Regions:
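Conserved hydrophobic beta-strands of the Rossmann-like cofactor-binding core
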Residues: 4-7, 84-85
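Conserved glycine-rich cofactor-binding loop
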Residues: 11-13
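Conserved glycine-rich Rossmann-like NAD(P)H-binding loop of the short-chain dehydrogenase/reductase
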Residues: 27-40
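Rossmann-fold cofactor-recognition segment
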Residues: 47-65
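Conserved NAD(P)H cofactor-binding loop of Rossmann-fold oxidoreductase domains
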Residues: 87-94
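Catalytic Tyr-X3-Lys loop
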Residues: 98-117
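Amphipathic alpha-helical dimer-interface segment in Rossmann-like NAD(P)H-dependent oxidoreductases
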Residues: 111-129
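Conserved small/polar residues in nucleotide/adenosyl-binding loops
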Residues: 133-135
Length: 135
């Protein structure tokens, strides 16, 4: 099994380029994004057509257990996750604090902060078992 680089928030910019780089270095790049399955497939094909190993799926990171189930599935069926790129952002626009609603702020927090916490909570013990990290 190849080590896995999990990219959560794999678009055409940073996430996609990180996926390409890790795949070129011998990793299996697993790409996730919330929408645009066609774009995701193009990104995966751009990696595999050059001999890299990649797969991916659409995921809504704020749904309960979505990230946790994804990580456990990858670990079981693809390989050990050695690298995670958490590249999600909440595009709520350039608003001042007084223009940002509570709902918009909460949504951004769920995506950016709470989602990363959930990833770390499930993945850190798995990485620690492989002596990849020390907590």
């Amino acid at each position: 099994m190849k080590p896995v680089c999990l990219i959560i928030g794999a678009g055409a910019g940073i996430g996609g380029n990180v996926a390409k780089k890790f795949a070129s270095e011998g990793y299996h790049s697993y790409l996730c994004r919330r929408t645009d399955e066609e774009g995701l497939d193009k990104l995966i094909n751009s990696i595999t057509s050059k001999g890299g190993s990649a797969s991916g799926s659409l995921i809504n990171a704020i749904e309960d257990n979505s990230l946790e189930e994804l990580i456990l599935d990858i670990e079981k069926n693809i390989g050990p996750i050695e690298v995670v790129v958490y590249n999600l952002g909440a595009q709520t626009g350039m608003k001042s604090l007084d223009q940002t609603t509570h709902k918009e702020f909460e949504w951004g927090w769920k995506i950016a902060s709470f989602g990363l916490f959930r990833v770390a909570k499930v993945l850190c013990p798995l990485m620690e078992d492989l002596s990849l990290i020390h907590i």
